[in-house]
Amino acid sequence: MKSRLDQFRATRNALLGLMMCASPAWAQTPAPAPLELRLADVGRFAVFVDMGAVQRTGSVVKLRVLQVAEGGFTAGAEAFWGGWRHEVIDCQARTIAHAGFASIRAGGREGPLTGDQRPAAPLSAGSADDAVAKVVCDAWRPYAKVPVATSVEAAVKIGRPLIETGAEP
């Protein structure tokens, strides 16, 4: 027996199929691009520049820097790998403005970005900030034998032993 609504069945099925294909539940998000974390300095922290996040506008560079803390670093009762520092560097004026920090707990969970952009200040010669500026402004490549890390976890595995030994470029 035929229903009066049979004439709409094909259209309904086509619309349902289209809605399912366009649904966010069915959409596949592309895998995030691997990081390119280049070691810039080793001191109290191992400092890596995220080369994929470098944004240039004239002589001004916006970037983020991964600070890897020494093994066993805790704040309160939680273990931390380190954190992301967000920076604005003026390569011509040789100044840096800190623009926030996001912690990274052991295991890789990132905290929110906190802090506002501070006024620009001159780079201190020989500091970690100076090393970062040399990497992004002058194409300096210290630690040439140290591999570029493609994840935060890899940077932690590379950086922590270097902090212990006090590696030099």
PLM regions with names:
Residues A25-P169:
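N-terminal secretory-pathway/extracellular module detecting exported/lumenal segments
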Residues M1, M19-M20, M51:
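Detector for methionine-enriched segments
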Residues N13-S23:
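Bacterial N-terminal signal peptides
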